Amino acid sequence: MPKTLHEIPRERPATPLLDRASSPAELRRLGEADLETLADELRQYLLYTVGQTGGHFGAGLGVVELTIALHYVFDTPDDRLVWDVGHQAYPHKILTERRELMGTLRQKDGLAAFPRRAESEYDTFGVGHSSTSISAALGMAIAARLQGKERKSVAVIGDGALTAGMAFEALNHASEVDADMLVILNDNDMSISHNVGGLSNYLAKILSSRTYSSMREGSKKVLSRLPGAWEIARRTEEYAKGMLVPGTLFEELGWNYIGPIDGHDLPTLVATLRNMRDMKGPQFLHVVTKKGKGFAPAELDPIGYHAITKLEAPGSAPKKTGGPKYSSVFGQWLCDMAAQDARLLGITPAMKEGSDLVAFSERYPERYFDVAIAEQHAVTLAAGMACEGMKPVVAIYSTFLQRAYDQLIHDVAVQHLDVLFAIDRAGLVGEDGPTHAGSFDISYLRCIPGMLVMTPSDEDELRKLLTTGYLFDGPAAVRYPRGSGPNHPIDPDLQPVEIGKGVVRRRGGKVALLVFGVQLAEAMKVAEGLDATVADMRFVKPLDEALVRELAGSHELLVSIEENAVMGGAGSAVGEFLAREGLEVPLLQLGLPDYYVEHAKPSEMLAECGLDAAGIEKAVRQRLDRQ
């Protein structure tokens, strides 16, 4: 059994066996008797490295044995291994020639937080969002068949990710094309199966054995010649398995279901995977693991230890903190507004903690809806609620709202329904990298007719603009970033602002900075040196055209600033207005460039994009020099 640790090691642990398994090829040269010791060493090393860098924590600890077994049995990278989401991929990175690079995890120019094709040939598919693995692995399996190659395709997906419709679409299609592939359900929440023991492991060995598989295929060939006989036999087998194992749903979808088995039992994992490797058609293995396995605090609190920050050196000064987190301001606003309006309903696609809906869910459980990883459903659910006079608020990360764009337009906006979108993690998100960045929401929202799009500059504005959007007659969106605000005093009253009106924060000379969002603080830092006017625009749509017209008539240069893609963003809205009205004033658009900004500290990412104070000042001075 895996050893259980109670503290994260600060010193690098001795890992003599892991040192001999830097690649899957080296791993496969070890004896099976060595694998359990290897698992203990890998878990200790994982604890140590994540303690040094911070990062996703519990999921990786839970798949140590599964990761070892997969690379031990399958011929990776020739066999294709696809991890869903990627939270659990750190052990995979350690075993695939990146152990000595783990100290650079999530740092600028270092290892990414998720599997990346550009990083390693063992990362067969780039991930970050959930529920994509089965579709990707199926595509690889079909390609292998068409290319005449014998390689295997394996997808590892969690029970949470399996709630998304995309996963079931792929399961259904795979059975239709009779794909030779293996899906492994990593059930680390016990949400599907609650009992795993000797009987389940024993049955898995039998049902995945070559003898059973050969007998099954032979019987199929014989009985298929007799009308109705094979169907009767198939149903009999299905019912018998259904009495003992919980895989009826997957059997009905056309998959050969094996499990559940103990995901921390290496001998059983290796034996079962070896058997299933050679089986034809769509195979489904149900593995039960414990999130945070081997680290006692994470086992007791898997949500709290989903990810951790790096350990601080003993005696180091406490980090300076800013104001409250923007998500916390939203969470408090939601509770306050719910107390005033019984029609308010809160919806989240599996982001209760991240979006700060915990307090709301406890105070108003009957008005709180966690729809799991189902963004499309979340948006249309809100639309249905709005049809009946309710006031739904969808709390969702910017990057995940992309997955429900059709529902946003077709089900909400076209019908002009009262749905408020509280869009968290807008802009750059730091160490999680481009898959989690909210780089495009202004661009994809401002083109939707009737949509109210707002960009608060601080905590107080966030609260006011949430109220404004909530009271608006139609669909509204408020975007706000990850992290803390500048500690601006917050008005406790639920007061809206006038729609489509920005605020001039400073009057200056020939340059006007038009700020959409939290870069206001950076703009104010350089305003005096540039003698610039600073406008807190607040609204992307409707744009404060009167303010833009005024500033265009009294300044020699307008500069739009936003933490969104320049292409199609708020600056584009300003440029379109200037062109439409024939206002001949130069416009400099500052925002996110036309490439994916790689993972780094948020400050490093903003500096790269020229959105910190120094970058803004440099860009403005260079433009003035050319005029």
From Swiss-Prot:
Disulfide bonds: none annotated. GO terms for molecular function: 1-deoxy-D-xylulose-5-phosphate synthase activity; magnesium ion binding; thiamine pyrophosphate binding. Pfam families: DXP_synthase_N (PF13292), Transket_pyr (PF02779), Transketolase_C (PF02780). Its EC number is 2.2.1.7. Pathway: Metabolic intermediate biosynthesis; 1-deoxy-D-xylulose 5-phosphate biosynthesis; 1-deoxy-D-xylulose 5-phosphate from D-glyceraldehyde 3-phosphate and pyruvate: step 1/1. Mg(2+) binds at residues 159, 188. It comes from the Bacteria. Keywords: Isoprene biosynthesis, Magnesium, Metal-binding, Thiamine biosynthesis, Thiamine pyrophosphate, Transferase. One of its GO terms (cellular component) is cytosol. Its cofactor is Mg(2+); thiamine diphosphate. Gene3D superfamilies: 3.40.50.920, 3.40.50.970. SUPFAM superfamilies: Thiamin diphosphate-binding fold (THDP-binding), TK C-terminal domain-like. GO terms for biological process: 1-deoxy-D-xylulose 5-phosphate biosynthetic process; isopentenyl diphosphate biosynthetic process, methylerythritol 4-phosphate pathway; terpenoid biosynthetic process; thiamine biosynthetic process. Thiamine diphosphate binds at residues 87, 128-130, 160-161, 188, 295, 375. PROSITE patterns: TRANSKETOLASE_2. It catalyses: D-glyceraldehyde 3-phosphate + pyruvate + H(+) = 1-deoxy-D-xylulose 5-phosphate + CO2. Binds 1 Mg(2+) ion per subunit. Binds 1 thiamine pyrophosphate per subunit. InterPro entries: Dxylulose-5-P_synthase (IPR005477), THDP-binding (IPR029061), Transketo_C/PFOR_II (IPR009014), Transketolase-like_Pyr-bd (IPR005475), Transketolase_BS (IPR020826), Transketolase_C (IPR033248). The keyword Magnesium applies. Homodimer. Belongs to the transketolase family. DXPS subfamily. Catalyzes the acyloin condensation reaction between C atoms 2 and 3 of pyruvate and glyceraldehyde 3-phosphate to yield 1-deoxy-D-xylulose-5-phosphate (DXP). This is 1-deoxy-D-xylulose-5-phosphate synthase. It comes from Pseudomonas paraeruginosa (strain DSM 24068 / PA7). The lineage of its organism: Bacteria, Pseudomonadati, Pseudomonadota, Gammaproteobacteria, Pseudomonadales.
